[in-house]
From Swiss-Prot:
Required cofactor(s): Mg(2+)
Summary of subunit composition and partner proteins: Homodimer.
Domain KARI N-terminal Rossmann: 2-182
Organism: Ignisphaera aggregans (strain DSM 17230 / JCM 13409 / AQ1.S1)
SUPFAM superfamilies the UniProt entry points to: 6-phosphogluconate dehydrogenase C-terminal domain-like, NAD(P)-binding Rossmann-fold domains
Annotated binding of Mg(2+) 2, by residue: D191, E227, E231
Family recorded in the similarity comment: Belongs to the ketol-acid reductoisomerase family.
Protein name: Ketol-acid reductoisomerase (NAD(P)(+))
Length: 335
């Protein structure tokens, strides 16, 4: 079973007198910077240029610095920019400007696990991966709560890397919910697998296939949309709140029986075998190499798919129905 740490198990002492540089001020960067500061820690914000993020950091009471200047004074350097930006940031603005022995911290293991960034041998390298978007990390902290997180250690030169990772998790509020000890390998591979097989890839293709099947068989697109897209949120919310058995107990007996019997027919052994192929592509680094090439070419596959999807029937119908539903909700809220 996983090792889970709670707020009372963790001390801020290992990072109390450290300067923490948050690189990036987007969704996670802003949440981490504000939460760590509110926890009484010394935070600086490092950015590549003076833009919207720079102005927002100033509005939040920070004095942002250029990345090179921030890492030069930091004891702990936290990468909170997108995965595919981290390599160039590392090479151009961090590697040759950071203090010797400064810690390198990540919120996702991609660049370290696949050796895209190769850290100095004298640095502690660790990860804190909150299991929610940045705005929720911030909002839950302000309400006195927190979101769960994973922590992992890649290099432990000081002998205190785990304690520092846990302290940061406490500082951003995650320990209030619970912090699970993991590894860079486990976090990276499971995160990519989840995105590809269910959260983005799997669910999107299942939605499209079910919608298109109904429309091809003569059902009205608007009705098909409600049944295959709109009602999905109701089911996911039930699973989120009550688990799979709680969801099954909450739906009708007809839905229960149909879902239990037909679900196994749709997601059969052949689908599970494909999932194992996907997992092996991730483990071997094949997906990472493919994605890096795609990114370096300007993401033609991604933009082609987005363009085709945007003009599809499911999206055209969806835009119309969402406008209709939101208009109805606005009318209710105005009364």
């Amino acid at each position: 079973m996983a090792k889970i740490y709670k707020d009372e198990d963790i001390s801020l002492e290992p990072i109390k007198n450290k300067t923490i540089a948050i690189l990036g001020y987007g969704s996670q960067g802003r949440a981490w910077a504000l939460n760590l500061r509110d926890s009484g820690l010394n935070v600086v914000v490092g950015l590549e240029r003076q833009g919207d993020s720079w102005r927002r950091a100033i509005d939040d009471g920070f004095k942002p610095m250029y990345t090179k200047d921030a890492v030069a004074i930091a004891d702990i350097i936290v990468f909170l920019v997108p995965d595919m930006v981290q390599k160039s940031l590392w090479l151009n603005s961090v590697k040759d400007f950071m203090k010797k022995g400064a810690d390198l911290v990540f919120a996702h293991g991609f660049n370290i696990h696949f050796k895209i960034i190769e850290p100095p041998k004298d640095s502690d390298v660790y990860m804190i991966a909150p299991k929610s978007p940045g705005p929720i990390v911030r909002r839950s902290y302000e309400m006195g709560g927190g979101v769960p997180a994973l922590v992992a250690v890649y290099q432990n030169v000081s002998g205190e890397a785990l304690q520092k990772a846990l302290a940061i998790a406490k500082g951003i509020g995650c320990a209030r919910a619970g912090v699970i000890e993991s590894t860079f390998k486990e976090e990276t591979e499971t995160d990519l697998f989840g995105e590809q097989v269910i959260l983005v890839g799997g669910i999107m293709e299942l939605i499209k296939a079910s919608f298109e099947t109904l429309v091809e068989e003569g059902y009205q697109p608007e009705v098909a949309y409600f049944e295959t897209v709109n009602e999905l949120k109701l089911i996911v919310d039930l699973i989120y709140e009550k688990g799979l058995t709680g969801m099954l107990r909450a739906v009708s007996d007809t839905a229960k029986y149909g879902g239990i019997t037909v679900g196994k027919f749709i997601i059969d052994k052949s689908v599970r075998d494909k999932m194992k192929i996907v997992l092996e592509r991730i483990r071997s680094g094949e997906f990472a190499r493919e994605w890096i090439k795609e990114y370096e070419r300007g993401m033609p596959t991604v933009f082609k798919e987005l363009s085709e999807l945007e003009g599809s029937t499911i999206e055209t119908v969806g835009r119309k129905l969402r406008e209709m539903m939101f208009r109805g909700m606005k009318q209710i809220s105005s009364h």
